[in-house]
Amino acid sequence: RLKKYAAVSAIALAGGMTTAAHAADSVNVAFFLEWATPNQISKVDKAYDDAMGVDVKWTDFSTGVQMTEAMLAGDIDIAYSQGLAPFVTAIQQGAPLKMVSVAVVYEANDCFVKDGLGITSANASELEGKTVAVPLNTMADFSFRKQMAALDVDMSTMTIVDQAPADGAVSLADGSVAMACIFGGASAKAAGEVGKPIM
C-alpha cells in the first residue's frame, strides 16, 4: 500500500506586501473554506483586523492554483494554506511570492473510483482509456501521478480533466468521470459517498 503523502500548506505573501501593508487601508486574504484551520476563528473574531490595524477581507478559493493566480493579478495579498505544490510551482516560474509560515500539515489526498465500476488496486489498469478529474498542479495531482505509477497505469491513455475537488466530487457522483482525486474534508466526504479510494 502506498503511503498517503503529507502535504504542507504554506502561508504566502505577494511581492511588495511586506512594505505596502503599512500604508494599506485593507488586506486581502485567500483561504480554503472547507479546511477547518484555526485562522477561521480569528477571522470571525476580527483578531487579524485588530492586530494589523486594517480591514482584513477574506476570499474563499477552491485550489491553491487559483490563489496563486489571484496573487499575481494583485487581487490577493496573503494566501493562507495555499498548498505546497502550487507555491513551489509558482516560485520555480519566478513568481514574487514569499513563504512566511506553515499553516497546516495534513494527510493528503485520495483518488476515489466510482462505485459500480469494479475497479480496485488489483485491476487498476482498467482505468486506462477512462476520464478522471484531477486538480492539476496540486498535491492531489502529485499523489494521483504517484499512485498511477505504483499501480502501473498508463496515464497517457486517460483523459485528465482539471477540476477543483468540489467539482470533481460532483463529476464522480453524476458519472462524468470514473475517478476523482480529492483534497479537503467536505469534498472527500462527498466523493466517499459515491466511490472508494483506489489505494
Predicted segments with their positions:
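Bacterial N-terminal signal peptides
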Residues: V8-G16
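Sec/Tat signal peptide C-region and signal peptidase I cleavage site
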Residues: G16-A23
